[in-house]
Amino acid sequence: YAGSKIAGEILCESYHKQFNMDISIVRIFSVYGPESNNHLVIPNIVTQLKNSNIIKLGNINSRRDFIFISDVINAFRIILNNINGFNVYNVGAEKSYSIKEICKKFEKLSGKKIIIKSNLKQTRKFDVKNIVCDATKLKKLGWKSKMSLDKGLKKCMNIKN
C-alpha cells in the first residue's frame, strides 16, 4: 500500500519534470466525518455506541492524526487555487490521539461508561504506532484546521444517532 503511494508520487514528479506539468499531491491523514464508512475507526465506534457501551477494537494505543472532512475540503480548495510546479501537501490537524483517547472523548460526549474490548489479533504488524501530520507547507498558503476534535466527534455522534 505505502509502496504504491510512493510509486505514484515518483510518477507524478517525473511527469512534472518531463512535461512541465503543474502537479499537486495531497496526503490526507485520518479523515473522518458524519458520513464516513464504518470500516474507519471513528464511525465504527459511533455505530457500536448506538447499540451498546461495549466497544470492540484492535490496538487502542495506536496514535493517529484525525482531520475533519470540512478541513480537508477547505485544503483542496486552497491547493486547487495554488497549483504551480510540483508540490506535496500534508493535510492533518498536526496532533495525534490514541484510539483509547478517542473512546474517552466519546464516553464524555455520550454520557455512557464505555467498556473497551481490545483484540490485538486485529492489529496489523506493519502499523505505525504514532502518526502526526506536518502541514507547514499547506499553512503557508493560508490553510489551517478549524474543526476541533471534540466538535468533530460531536457532529459524528449527532448524525449517526
Question: What is the predicted role of each segment?
Answer:
Residues 24-42:
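Flexible, glycine-rich beta-alpha linker
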Residues 43, 49-161:
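C-terminal substrate-binding subdomain of Rossmann-fold SDR/epimerase-dehydratase oxidoreductases
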Residues 17, 30-33, 47, 62:
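Active-site micro-motifs of SAM-dependent methyltransferase domains
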Residues 1-9, 39-43, 65-66, 96:
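Short-chain dehydrogenase/reductase
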Residues 1-24, 50-51:
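Active-site Tyr-X1-5-Lys
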Residues 1, 15, 29-32, 66, ...:
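Conserved hydrophobic/aromatic "anchor" residues
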Residues 7, 11, 15, 45, ...:
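Hydrophobic alpha-helix immediately C-terminal to the catalytic Tyr-X-X-X-Lys motif of short-chain
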